[in-house]
UniProtKB/Swiss-Prot annotation:
This is Large ribosomal subunit protein eL21. It comes from Methanosphaera stadtmanae (strain ATCC 43021 / DSM 3091 / JCM 11832 / MCB-3). The keyword S-adenosyl-L-methionine does not apply. GO terms for biological process: translation. One of its GO terms (cellular component) is ribosome. InterPro entries: Ribosomal_eL21, Ribosomal_eL21_arc, Ribosomal_eL21_sf, Translation_prot_SH3-like_sf.
Length: 96
């Protein structure tokens, strides 16, 4: 059988969540508002599949450069290459 090369392959530990979080999906995460220029951390919530970035970007920090519907455009550096990701607010956390 061939090896799987799916979207979430090789992410068993990266996307694992704690056994019993206090609230599975707090509504406050979904209604977060970010301004253009804010620095945000990309923290993938594996229980929400819409607007989820690729697991390779989990833990990266980027800058909000715009909005596309309910999602945000986040500019990051992947090595030397600049990339723009479309991510919903459930997977973002404001840098303090």
């Amino acid at each position: 059988m061939r090896k799987s090369k799916g979207f979430k392959s090789r992410s068993r530990y990266k996307l694992k969540r704690s056994i019993r979080p206090k609230r599975a999906n707090p509504i406050s995460r979904k209604i977060q508002v970010f301004e253009v220029g804010n620095k945000v951390h990309i923290i993938v919530d594996s229980s929400i599949h819409r607007g989820q970035p690729h697991p390779r970007f989990h833990g990266k920090t980027g800058e909000v450069v715009g909005q596309k519907g309910k999602a945000y455009l986040v500019a990051i550096k992947d090595g030397n290459k600049a990339k723009e990701l479309i991510i919903r607010p459930e997977h973002l956390k404001l840098q303090e």
